């Protein structure tokens, strides 16, 4: 009887889990975005001081609950030598958030090259991609049209998948909630990558 009730409880209350990769060059604001996401969606999470965030070497993990979905974020280091590790996580993921530093015009071509490798990977075929033009709170930042123009060569390589380019300021939190909610809709309806299985035994 206990097993039946335990299974029913899990079925009723356990959330479907989706793994989301947060990718982009170093200093794009990936970890700040992750912290803002946790602060906005987790009521009891106080968050770390954004000024204390340093360059990620390896992996940061965070979890956010949105409705009946649980998003498990994997924030991967963006330095060139760490980008070769990104594809180790592709098979497990349900969505990609690609963060661009829209104040760093000098590295835009480098960011585009890294993005191209992501969207052309067969392991990510059909996986939704949210492109965040971060640091939009800075007056001298590139606009969304500027970034879309710079990345226009990638349009044909995105393939048949949900893809959105959105303005964001991870520092102020602007655009964070909207981006996460868009991603949730996409991963939930993507039948090609079902959520992690519930354990209802």
Swiss-Prot record:
Write out the function statement from the record. Answer: Trans-Golgi-associated GTPase that regulates protein sorting. Controls the targeting of ARL1 and its effector to the trans-Golgi. Required for the lipidation of chylomicrons in the intestine and required for VLDL lipidation in the liver.
Q: Which GO terms describe its cellular component?
A: cytosol; Golgi apparatus; membrane; trans-Golgi network; trans-Golgi network membrane
> Which terms does the record give in the GO molecular function aspect?
GTP binding; GTPase activity
Q: Which SMART domains does the UniProt entry name for this protein?
A: ARF (SM00177), RAB (SM00175), SAR (SM00178)
Residues engaged in binding GTP: 24-31, 75-79, 134-137
Q: Which organism is it from?
A: Homo sapiens
- Where is the protein found, in the record's own terms? Golgi apparatus; Golgi apparatus, trans-Golgi network
Keywords in alphabetical order: Acetylation, Golgi apparatus, GTP-binding, Nucleotide-binding
Keyword Transmembrane helix on entry = no
State how it assembles.
Answer: Interacts with SYS1.
User: Which family, according to UniProt?
Assistant: Belongs to the small GTPase superfamily. Arf family.
Tell me if Nucleotide-binding is a UniProt keyword of this record. Answer: yes
Q: Which GO terms describe its biological process?
A: gastrulation; Golgi to plasma membrane protein transport; intracellular protein transport; protein localization to Golgi apparatus; retrograde transport, endosome to Golgi; signal transduction
On the tree of life, the source organism's domain of life is Eukaryota
Name the record gives this protein: ADP-ribosylation factor-related protein 1
The UniProt entry lists the main location of this chain as: Golgi
SUPFAM superfamilies to which the protein is assigned, alphabetical: P-loop containing nucleoside triphosphate hydrolases
């Amino acid at each position: 009887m206990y097993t039946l009730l335990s299974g029913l409880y899990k079925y009723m209350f356990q959330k479907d889990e989706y793994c989301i990769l947060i990718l982009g060059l170093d200093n794009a604001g990936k970890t700040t975005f992750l912290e803002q996401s946790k602060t906005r969606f987790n009521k009891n999470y106080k968050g770390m001081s954004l000024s204390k965030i340093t360059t990620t070497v390896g992996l940061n993990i965070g979890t956010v609950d949105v409705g009946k979905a649980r998003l498990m974020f994997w924030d991967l280091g963006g330095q060139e030598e760490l980008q070769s590790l990104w594809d180790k996580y592709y098979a497990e993921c349900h969505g990609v958030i690609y963060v661009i530093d829209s104040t760093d015009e000098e590295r835009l071509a480098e960011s585009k090259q890294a993005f191209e490798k992501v969207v052309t990977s067969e392991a990510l075929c059909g996986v939704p991609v949210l492109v965040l033009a971060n640091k939009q709170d800075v007056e001298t930042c590139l606009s969304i049209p500027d970034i879309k123009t710079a990345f226009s060569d990638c349009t044909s390589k995105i393939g048949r998948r949900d893809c959105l380019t959105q303005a964001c300021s991870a520092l102020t939190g602007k655009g964070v909630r909207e981006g996460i909610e868009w991603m949730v809709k996409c991963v939930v309806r993507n039948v090609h990558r079902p959520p992690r299985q519930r354990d209802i035994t």
